Amino acid sequence: MNKILIRNFCTNIKNESTKPLIDNIYKNILKDNFKIVEIKDCKNNRGLFYNPIESPTQTLSVINPKTNKPNLIFKEEPFISYPSIIKSNENICNHCLKEIKKEEEEIKQECEECKVYKYCSIECKEKSSIEYHSVLCKSTGSGFNYLEKHASIEKRRFPLLAGKILARMIMGYHLEKSSKSTWLPLQMLSFAKKPPPLEWKDDYLIFSRSLLKGINNESMKKKFDYDWFVRVMQILYLNTIGIDIDPNQQSTKMSSPESGIGLYLLTSFINHDCDPNAFIHFPDDHTMHLSPLKPINPGDEITISYTDTTKDLVDRRSQLFENYGFNCECKKCLNDLLIKRNK
């Protein structure tokens, strides 16, 4: 395993006292999807498995015979997301990342306070306010716009996602008096145990000056120290997904500067395979849809590709090692390796 990048898990150490807590957090992450999938231990530590409670012996087909359309395993809204930082976002909903078309201009919404953020609907505007914008809005004294400028210049989006995570945690403490629905679920995700690069210190300096100065509660402010920031960045490093909204496009986990980016809690448990049985796509907005590529039997692990499966063995493995810290040993890679050696 790469000494620079190691996949680690906050829940590696398990005992009888922590199991009920972990099971409860998994339940909150699964939500209604517990009827379809389950999180289980596997050779890659943990994975997501097809487990249809209401039809425990039924294979999931690629095409739904009733609608003659591709089947849907489940869909998930992101914990946080952010649009492209190199494309114009003037006509992009700041919440769901959907394009606001000219004919929809009349229903377009904006924040009355900052006049900066635009939304495609009242629903998106309200969700944004409840989840994070009430904390990040310029009218509250937040300096999130300075963090956005920094991220745009340096071409680094993770600090922006970290800012939204901070906002969601503050809103969680404000509305629920706990971190049950915010920080605890994030602790279940794998993270890259890598030495913090020097630029993370620069990012945190801007981050703290932009966002922490507005927090009056000193005990809460201390929660968001540099160690917290590093852990968040490590989580984002392994778990973010590129968002390319296109009803006809299949996506991999990797993002490009042109794409949006998001963190999805349940989807983060899906392991990689170079010959996956499922794929992610974004037909409408930032809501992730998971559909089968091949029939999936009850008990099968659901896998997606983190990289372009049309690339050759060397390119696939190099990309996966560089970005996710593992040497892929799926059946496709082992078979390709055998063919390569026999040539």
From Swiss-Prot:
TM segment ranges: none
UniProt superkingdom: Eukaryota
GO cellular component terms attached to this protein's record: nucleus
ZnF endpoints (MYND-type): 93-137
GO biological process, one term: methylation
Keyword S-adenosyl-L-methionine set for record: yes
Keywords tagged on the record: Metal-binding, Methyltransferase, S-adenosyl-L-methionine, Transferase, Zinc, Zinc-finger
Matching CDD domains: SET_SMYD
Keyword S-adenosyl-L-methionine: yes
Residues reported to bind Zn(2+) 1: 93, 96, 120, 124
Entry binding sites for Zn(2+) 2: 111, 114, 133, 137
EC number(s) reported in the record: 2.1.1.-
Domain SET span(s) in chain numbering: 77-307
Function, as annotated: Probable methyltransferase.
Stated family: Belongs to the class V-like SAM-binding methyltransferase superfamily.
Name by which UniProt lists this protein: SET and MYND domain-containing protein DDB_G0292454
Source organism of this protein record: Dictyostelium discoideum (Social amoeba)
